[in-house]
Amino acid sequence: MEYEFRRNSLTGTYLASFSMDHEVLGQWFSEELGPELAKIQQVLDIIKDIQAGKRDSWRLIGGDLTLDLDEEQARIYANALGFEQEYELEESMSLYDAESEAYCGLEDLEEALLSWYKFVEKGR
């Protein structure tokens, strides 16, 4: 999983871009976490708790995206995917694509979060 972080020098906006099949992580980092160091640290602390066996799983529901963590992986998905559909969507209208949902290993997410934390902290 590859990623790149940028900061718009005019607006001060922090942006994260992730490799194919993980694009939604970039949106989650940029929009749901943003430059809030306390929120980033909260997720890092939860990951440590899960790795230490203090928790089995954890969920953070954001404005547009949700993060689910368990002992093995992280899942980030659009909140719209969490609702059951009463009818079948046409294949071309499917919500399940790389821009709506992604999985990665817990350690991979932890590494990316640490990098994001350092990037944001450095830019202040």
UniProtKB/Swiss-Prot annotation:
Signal peptide (residue range): none
Pfam families listed in its UniProt record: UPF0231
Top-level taxon: Bacteria
Family: Belongs to the UPF0231 family.
Protein name (record): UPF0231 protein Shewmr7_3366
Species this chain originates from: Shewanella sp. (strain MR-7)
